[in-house]
Regions:
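Histidine-centered catalytic micro-motifs
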Residues: 6-16, 60-68, 119-126
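Active-site HxH/HxHxD metal-binding segment of metal-dependent hydrolases
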Residues: 1-58, 138-142
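A generic local structural motif
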Residues: 16-19, 45, 65-66, 104-108
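Ligand/cofactor pocket segment of small-molecule handling proteins
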Residues: 49, 61, 71
Length: 157
C-alpha cells in the first residue's frame, strides 16, 4: 500500500488530529475542501475529482455539519464523513453547522446518488458500520422526504 493523500472530509479535530505529522512521515499530501481554514497541500471544490492509481473519487460539497464538509464517491462507494451516518446524520450545533445547508446536502446531493452506493460514514454510530444510499433513504429518519422547514425543526436548528 502506497498512500498518496490524506483526505479530510471536514475540519473537526476528531478527523484531522495528527494528519500533518502523518503526512510528513508518509510524504503524502493533505486534501480538503477550499472552505477549510486548516493547513493543506491541495484544495478541492464541488465537482472535482481526486485521482490515485486506477481509481478516482468525485468530490461533493455537502456543508451542514461544517462549512467544508465533503463526500467522496467512487468505485460504488460513498465516504460521507459526518454528513450522513447509518441511521442518522452529523450534528449541526458545532461552529459552521447549518440545518438548512445539511438539508440540501442530504436531499439535493446524496439522495440523488445511486441507491446502490455503499455508505462508509465517518463514525460507526448505527446498527451497522456500512449501509447503502437506498437503505438509508428507506430507513434513516433524517433521509425521509420532508421539506426544508420540517428538517430544520427536526434538527433543532
Amino acid at each position: 500500500l502506497n498512500p498518496k493523500y490524506i483526505i479530510n472530509t471536514h475540519w473537526h479535530d476528531d478527523h484531522t488530529r495528527g494528519n500533518e505529522d502523518l503526512a510528513k512521515e508518509l510524504s503524502v499530501k493533505i486534501v480538503q475542501h477550499n472552505a477549510s481554514q486548516l493547513k493543506n497541500d491541495l484544495t478541492v471544490s464541488d465537482g472535482d475529482s481526486i485521482k490515485f492509481g486506477c481509481s478516482e473519487l468525485a468530490v461533493y460539497h455537502t456543508p451542514g455539519h461544517s462549512k467544508d464538509s465533503i463526500c467522496l464517491v467512487g468505485d460504488g462507494k460513498i465516504f460521507s464523513g459526518d454528513t450522513l451516518f447509518v441511521g442518522n446524520c452529523g450534528r449541526i450545533d458545532l461552529p459552521g453547522g447549518s440545518a438548512k445547508e445539511l438539508y440540501h446536502g442530504l436531499f439535493d446531493v446524496i439522495a440523488n446518488l445511486s441507491d446502490d452506493l455503499v455508505l462508509y460514514p465517518g463514525h460507526d454510530y448505527g446498527s451497522s458500520s456500512t449501509s447503502t444510499i437506498g437503505k438509508e433513504k428507506q430507513t434513516n429518519p433524517v433521509m425521509q422526504k420532508m421539506n426544508e422547514d420540517s428538517f430544520v425543526d427536526r434538527m433543532g436548528g
